Amino acid sequence: MLNKLINRLKSLFPGRQLGAYSLVGVWNTLFGYGLYAALVWGLDGKLKFAYMWANVLSNFIAITQAFFLYKFFVFKTKGHYWQEYIKCWMVYGAAALIGLAVLPLLVETLRALLPLAYKTYAPYAGGALLTALTVLCSFLGLKNFSFRTVENSLLSRVKERWALQTQPQRRVMFLGLILAAGFLIALAVCALGLILHWQYYPYTTFLFDPRYRFTDLYETLILARGHTAGLNYFPLLMGFMRAVSQGPERILCAVFVSLWVAFYVSIVYKGLPQLPHKAGWTVLLAVGSFPLWFLADRANLEGFVFMACAGFVISFWRGRMNWAAFWLALAVNMKPHPAVFMVLFLRDKQYKALAKWLVLCVLIGALCSWAAHFDWLSFQRNVQTFSDWQQFLPFGLEFSHTFFNLLRLPVFLATQNGLPDSWQATVAFSRLVAPGYAVAMLGLFAFISAHVVFVRPAFWKALLLLTLAEVFFPFVSHDYTLIHLILPVLFFLNAPPMPPKQSVFITVCLAVLLIPMNFWTHSFYHSLMYDLVLNAGTFLRPLAAGVLLAYLLKDFSFARLKTGIKNYFSAKK
């Protein structure tokens, strides 16, 4: 194992470069960290978050002197000063940007862990840990990008390896890289917000909203203990929560969140096509999937709905229709929106499975209502209150990413001339367009259903169309419901080859729906009871979903639909 590692290092560092790089690297490390420590010492007490300013200033000076040392003593390239200096900044600057986001996490964690007498040393220890993580990555970036030649070009090797991959493998890599870039941008914006606003997460938004940490689970437990109907949850989910509500809240939260994350990661791993370093790409896709972390951050019970929907999709794909009917009945008895997937039974003429699903829905609902003493009148009032609160008032704009919010958002922004005028205008507009919106979405869903049943697009496309309808068509649909998108995404990644432009376009649209966007926010209203903070996702995600929906239906024609209807009813099962 050790010999293999040594040989690998020799292949990366030909000739004397390893020794020269080591000497220069040691000097750069000592110089950079010494300058950082000196600036921390000098600025401490004069500026808030002095270690952040020290990190920025020391990086600027250290990167410039490192450029000359690497150019003249390690890689010994000729000319191209400005080009190589800019490239050097691109390598070191990227590392510095990531470090700028990671440094406060290290420092604040060390401050929390260190004894009181040593807390003042946290910035120095955090800087040392961060420095140790960047040495090897910096060399690879400098050698293969800043001072590269044609012979040692990492880019050329990447192109060669890319050419050997199948199109499904390329989709995985492309999607993973976009998700990773989105995650790093979120980190960078978090660090920038820290510098500009002098606040550190969780006082500023990163991937989540820190005001509601695990609140969905805790509120549901409180409701379950009071034996009242819970928000918009159906009897099955509330009955389960009542059964476990007497347990310790933190343990329940840890168990549920761990279960959802582990299930999500395992689904991604099993669903990816075979490719090199599959485990690494699985981690990359999971870490970059914002809906998973938002669901975990809120500890929302949508995780159980997702598990049931995943069970349905897997069972349906494998032809186990009885299990598919069972899992879909469980999902619908937790929340109604997964009922859209019953269209797949019609698509494959699985009428018996459809009938079994309907019977199971009634039986499970009746049994859970009886066992949990479910109060349907209170449930109806709670649903109505929740709908009025989220559907008509501007509060629903904060986390909801539906097409309905896409219509309301311009009205709210255009009437921001002071409260309560903007609220009244938004409420009036919401009530005005709500009936028409409901009719339009029902009509669009009927159109999509007809397309799925009679035209019979590929399974991944049918599943994606129905999932988009499930997530974006309702009046209210919060960010964590986007977790369902990973199911059609995995089938798309395994789809047969298609035109490259089509593959790239769909991959980009799906990535936009999954990357974090909550870091781009603006606060419109603040009170002791509630803050209204709009984020970019409430606008960009429905927009991307609309574009993707139109693209998936671009080949529709009434002639094909007519032919499909004729074939559907004339062909044998």
What kind of feature is each model-predicted range?
Residues M307-R318, L344-K349, A353, I486-K501, ...:
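Transmembrane alpha-helices and membrane-interface helical segments
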Residues K78-A95:
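Juxtamembrane helix-capping/reentrant segments at transmembrane boundaries
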Residues F491-K573:
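Aromatic-enriched
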Residues L12-A20, K46-I61, L114-L133, T166, ...:
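Membrane-interface starts of transmembrane alpha-helices
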Residues A62, L301-A310, P336-A339, T481-L490, ...:
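Hydrophobic core segments of transmembrane alpha-helices in multi-pass, intramembrane catalytic enzymes
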Residues L328-F345, F473-H484:
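Transmembrane helices and adjacent periplasmic/lumenal helix-loop junctions
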Residues M1-P14, L154-P168:
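Short, Lys/Arg-rich, polar N-terminal cytosolic tail immediately upstream
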Residues R157-W323, D348-A462, L466-D479, K562-S570:
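Primarily membrane-embedded glycan-assembly and transfer machineries that use lipid-linked glycans
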